[in-house]
Design a protein with these regions (language model features):
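Long, solvent-exposed, polar/charged low-complexity segments
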Residues: 1-15, 44, 151-222
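Active-site acidic/histidine clusters and adjacent loop/turn architecture
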Residues: 14-67
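Short histidine-centered catalytic/ligand-binding loop motif
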Residues: 29-36, 116, 126-131, 191, ...
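Aromatic- and glycine-enriched beta-alpha-beta binding-site module
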Residues: 72-132
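A short, surface-exposed loop/turn module that caps and links secondary-structure elements
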Residues: 53-80, 84, 149-162
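Inter-helical turn/loop segments and adjacent helix faces that build the functional surface
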Residues: 20-27, 121, 125, 192
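Long, hydrophobic, amphipathic alpha-helical segments used as structural scaffolds
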Residues: 47, 51, 55, 142, ...
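Compact, glycine/acidic-enriched structural inserts
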Residues: 106-164
């Protein structure tokens, strides 16, 4: 059961940033396991179990990131990631091109939300076509998002706007990649078991957005 991260979690992430090498990591591996790896896996398991109970008609697929970077893609970085995350999807048959729910912790902050890790150009073109064909479903979702203060629309914009469906949907329409995120500084919630409930509530709020985006990717594959 998740009981919260700790100051030691943040200390480890900062120290790893400045000592990102195998000898240091091996010397501090038990600290990693105790303060980051096991709490992350416990949080992910608790959130997944709660979502399965709350939404029994859905199948949830969990992935917890490993601390080890792909040795083929270091590009001058150290062998270990300086952040850690987990993702949840309702479809295991496709990869990171479909949206996912996520939680991530870094030395600076933590975040959770839902969106694309990356999105193909065809996916976003299909997204724009869906808006053009019927803007009302996304209009309702955009208004719902604007009526709360936990999640915000983020993600890289196209350098040149793809179109203008009106002030409300313009920020959505012109995203190269789309994310609904909540970013917080390290606070009491991070160090509390109440984080589990916060994620479950947040992911529940984001489910209609996930369904909308996931349906877009299915239309693209059709």
């Amino acid at each position: 059961m998740f009981t919260g991260f700790s100051d030691a979690t943040i200390d480890f992430l900062w120290e790893l940033r400045f000592h990102n090498e195998r000898p240091w990591f091996l010397e501090h591996k038990q600290v990693f396991l105790d303060t980051l790896d096991r709490p992350m896996k416990a949080l992910a398991a608790d959130v997944t179990a709660a979502l399965e109970q709350a939404y029994p008609d859905r199948k949830w697929y969990l992935h917890v990131a490993r601390i080890y970077r792909d040795a083929r893609r270091l590009h001058g970085n150290g062998p270990y990631k300086e952040n850690l995350w987990f993702t949840l999807r309702c479809d295991s048959s496709r990869g990171p091109e479909i949206p996912a729910f996520y939680f991530e912790i870094t030395p600076h902050n933590y975040s959770y939300g839902m969106g694309f890790y990356w999105a193909k150009a065809n996916t976003m073109a299909c997204f724009r076509r869906a808006i053009d064909a019927d803007p009302l479903p996304l209009t309702a979702l955009a208004e719902r998002l604007n009526a709360q203060d936990t999640f915000v629309l983020t993600g890289q914009d196209y350098a040149r706007a793809k179109g203008d469906p009106g002030a409300l949907l313009h920020p959505w329409y012109n995203k190269r990649v789309l994310d609904l995120s909540c970013v917080r500084e390290h606070d009491d919630l991070l160090f509390s078991p109440a984080l589990t409930d916060a994620l479950v509530r947040g992911f529940g709020f984001l489910l209609p957005y996930y369904d909308y985006l996931e349906a877009v990717t299915r239309r693209e594959d059709a």
